[in-house]
Design a protein with these regions (language model features):
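Membrane-embedded alpha-helical bundles that constitute the cytochrome b-like, heme-associated redox core
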Residues: 1-133
Length: 133
């Protein structure tokens, strides 16, 4: 006689995870966040040191400082690493806490678009100062 009670399935974590998609993009995202975090340590130290060193300086001195190739390159790297790290972090927050797909997609597009816009403006400013206006 057949039993009408459903059998318990003994499925471990690996079995439950199968079929949920690839974790490759998650791993790349995780690595990108770690790499930008490590890159930001010396860049942030350089930036803070520079700001402290330039405290009280007039606009001409700051302009002269940023027009030097080393300063312009380091500032550009700092901007790119900071805003890329920010975009990665915001993406995780939105994906984890916004549950409606339409709102999630809209939020990601708006926030990432704003981040790209601000980063591009900052890079344009550095470039404009570095090559002269």
């Amino acid at each position: 006689m057949a039993s009408h009670h459903p059998q318990k399935r003994l499925v471990g974590p690996l079995g439950r995870a199968r079929g949920l998609g690839s974790a490759k993009s998650g791993l790349q995202h995780w690595w990108a966040q770690r790499v930008t975090a490590v890159a930001l340590v010396p860049l942030t130290l350089w930036f803070v040191f520079s700001v402290v060193h330039l405290t009280g300086a007039d606009q001409a001195r700051v302009h002269d400082w940023l027009s030097r190739p080393a300063s312009a390159i380091l500032m550009s790297l700092f901007i790119v690493a900071t805003f890329y790290h920010l975009a990665l972090g915001v993406q995780v927050v939105v994906e984890d806490y916004v549950h409606r797909e339409g709102v999630k997609l809209t939020s990601l597009l708006l926030v990432k678009g704003l981040i790209v816009l601000i980063a591009a403006a900052a890079l344009f400013t550095v470039l404009r100062v570095a090559v002269g206006s």
